[in-house]
Amino acid sequence: YKKASLKPALIYIYPSLPILALWQVYLDQGMFALFWLIIIVAACDSGAYFIGKLMGKTPFSPISPNKTLEGVIGGLICASVIGTILGVFVYSFWLSSLCSFFVAIFAVIGDLLESYFKREAGVKDSGDLIPGHGGVLDRIDAVIIAAFVMVALL
């Protein structure tokens, strides 16, 4: 087999597995967990963006050169706090905080993974459906990986 021959399969595998993970979150835990996941990821992305713009100096990864260490830490803190506050309405404090923290970590990993795939493919943005935001995958890349973590932890 050739390494290059597996690349076209990623077009089908990459979106299929996360959809199954999101569906599993919904089936196992209900609509609250699905919205909770999306809110944690949004808090991580937003916190990272704003803290990174305000205080970011240290580059985080060559895969995504605009990310800063300060932004990533700020995003993890924002997501953990907001996720825990929302999660305790349904789950225990410890499960809420643990799940929020790990979902946030894997949201960052998902974002970096999607950036890596785009760089390998020589693509700057993953579409123009959402102007100014780099495409649809840039909006859901973090949710894609984080969904697997939520399935495992809940």
Regions found by a protein language model. Name each.
Residues 151-154:
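Juxtamembrane boundary at the C-terminal end of a transmembrane helix
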Residues 1-68, 72-105:
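Membrane-embedded alpha-helical bundles of polytopic integral membrane proteins
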Residues 41-57, 69-70, 105-145:
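Acidic (Asp/Glu-rich) catalytic motifs at the cytosolic membrane interface
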